[in-house]
């Protein structure tokens, strides 16, 4: 259940709601009865699980409301987003990180799974693949520390859309290896894949083809859940029939793939890029840890994470002019991979990029 902006931010604050923006970005539910009616309407057919995205204000009150009204199957929340940095909520970045952590802990205490809506938000803003991979590692680490037992990782392919299939797959495999390094008897990970929200072509035949080829690529990482993005995404909000059609298309592709498909993950080019990304990601993670050398676990410290964004260790080109991040990083698609580059478009190693970031931060301070 995708909520509109006022449902997510101002559900408990009707006076702050703007009737002119009703339905902006999702379903305009306004009362608990609205949610109960939606849940009752779903009690037919195969009696599906139902879940909604978390609120962007009054987080714990909103979470409790979702559990009571729609038996929320799992929490879906972010770590760095859905706050003042992206305009989706009122909280400053560091406070928002703390609130997201509290929300994870609340669900962990109740043995409710948590889905991470995080890495692809960096990808959609043209961040380099290394930053996306680093955030995958950080979110998994934070979720485990907050007591989450079942973590649903979200891998949005084609984000940004100028990734090649080869490099997209390599990035996903790197994220999987990094995130799943925390798996043990107390912490399970369920892989969820989806097609890129910004990747669909406008033409209907091309969009249908894109959905099918995207799901086939996703199946190579053996997802437990496929989040189907309707093929109409680039043109209009999907109708019920179009949602059903999109799900049937994705389901058929998944069935075909499960009968036996070539192993695209074995491509040596894919494997080489995956290993490169993992190595470069650890360079970035070490740089973030070094911001707070006196802490035992800097990667789960809200102040450290907010500072990593503030100085540009975690950055994206589309964060330019943002009060919480420099947006100074430059990226380019090179051979289908998203890499950080210098002013002349030359690819930078992660060590080179970090040295530039730290030098700039020292001057600014």
Question: Model features per residue range: what roles?
Answer:
Residues 1-14, 18, 45, 225-238, ...:
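Acidic, glycine-enriched catalytic cores built around paired aspartates
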Residues 1-160, 350-365:
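Catalytic alpha/beta active-site cores
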Residues 5-8, 17, 61, 95, ...:
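Residue-identity detector for glutamine
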Residues 15, 21, 42, 52-54, ...:
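Generic serine detector
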Residues 28-33, 55-61, 65, 170, ...:
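Aromatic-enriched hydrophobic runs in primary sequence
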Residues 28-35, 59, 93-96, 100, ...:
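Generic structural signal for well-ordered, non-membrane alpha-helical segments
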Residues 39-46, 67-70, 104-111, 144, ...:
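Structural signal for hydrophobic packing residues in well-ordered secondary-structure cores
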Residues 90-91, 111-245:
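Long alpha-helical, hydrophobic tracts
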């Amino acid at each position: 259940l995708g909520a509109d902006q006022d449902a997510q931010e101002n559900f408990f604050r009707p006076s702050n709601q703007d009737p002119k923006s009703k339905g902006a970005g999702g379903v305009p539910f306004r009362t608990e009865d609205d949610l109960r009616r939606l849940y009752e309407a779903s009690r037919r057919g195969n009696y599906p699980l139902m879940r909604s995205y978390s609120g962007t204000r009054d987080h714990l009150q909103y979470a409790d409301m979702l559990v009571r009204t729609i038996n929320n199957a799992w929490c879906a929340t972010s770590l760095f987003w859905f706050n003042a940095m992206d305009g989706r909520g009122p909280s400053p970045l560091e406070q928002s990180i703390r609130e997201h952590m509290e929300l994870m802990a609340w669900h962990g205490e109740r043995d409710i799974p948590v889905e991470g809506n995080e890495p692809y938000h960096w990808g959609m803003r043209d961040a380099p693949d290394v930053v996306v991979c680093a955030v995958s590692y950080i979110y998994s680490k934070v979720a485990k520390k907050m007591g989450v037992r079942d973590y649903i990782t979200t891998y949005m392919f084609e984000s940004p859309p100028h990734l090649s299939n080869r490099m997209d797959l390599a990035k996903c495999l790197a994220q999987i290896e990094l995130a799943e390094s925390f798996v043990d008897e107390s912490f399970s990970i369920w892989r969820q894949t989806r097609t890129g929200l910004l990747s669909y072509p406008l033409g209907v035949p091309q969009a249908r083809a894109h959905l099918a080829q995207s799901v086939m690529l996703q199946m190579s990482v053996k997802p437990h859940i496929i989040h189907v993005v309707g093929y109409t995404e680039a043109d209009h909000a999907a109708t019920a029939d179009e949602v059903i059609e999109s799900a049937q298309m994705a389901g058929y592709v998944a069935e075909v793939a499960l009968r036996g498909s070539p192993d695209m993950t074995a491509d040596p080019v894919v494997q080489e890029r995956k290993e490169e990304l993992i190595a470069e990601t650890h360079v970035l993670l070490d740089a973030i840890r070094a911001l707070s050398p006196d802490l035992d676990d800097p990667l789960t410290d809200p102040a450290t994470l907010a500072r990593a964004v503030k100085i540009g260790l975690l950055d994206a080109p589309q964060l330019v002019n943002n009060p919480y991040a420099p947006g100074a990083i430059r990226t380019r698609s090179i051979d289908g991979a998203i890499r950080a580059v210098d002013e002349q478009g030359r690819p930078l190693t992660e060590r080179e990029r970090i040295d530039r970031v730290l030098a700039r931060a020292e001057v600014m301070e």
